[in-house]
UniProtKB/Swiss-Prot annotation:
Native species: Arabidopsis thaliana
Chain's role: Copper chaperone for cytochrome c oxidase (COX). Binds 2 copper ions and delivers them to the Cu(A) site of COX.
Coiled coil location: none
This protein's name: Cytochrome c oxidase copper chaperone 2
Motif range (Cx9C motif 2): 54-64
GO cellular component, one term: mitochondrial intermembrane space
Record keywords, A-Z: Chaperone, Copper, Disulfide bond, Metal-binding, Mitochondrion
Length: 72
């Protein structure tokens, strides 16, 4: 029976490591829900002043998304 216990513990150790790798590479939020503050500022600026005048807010939102794990 000791052989079965060792085998079971080895199998249970493999599963969490796979889950940890998956959660590290996958963003926790959907991109539409990440960084609501910078998204709001960016959108309001674009509506009022046009995209070319809002590069500061666009870049701030992109940096925020990248910090959340999104590749944009």
């Amino acid at each position: 029976m000791s052989g079965l216990q060792a085998q079971d513990s080895a199998c249970s150790l493999d599963k969490p490591s796979k889950d940890v790798v998956a959660t590290e590479t996958k963003p926790k939020k959907r991109i539409c829900c990440a960084c609501p503050d910078t998204k709001k500022l960016r959108d309001e600026c674009i509506v009022e002043h046009g995209e070319s005048a809002c590069t500061k807010w666009i870049e701030a939102h992109i940096l925020c998304l990248r910090s959340e794990g999104f590749k944009v």
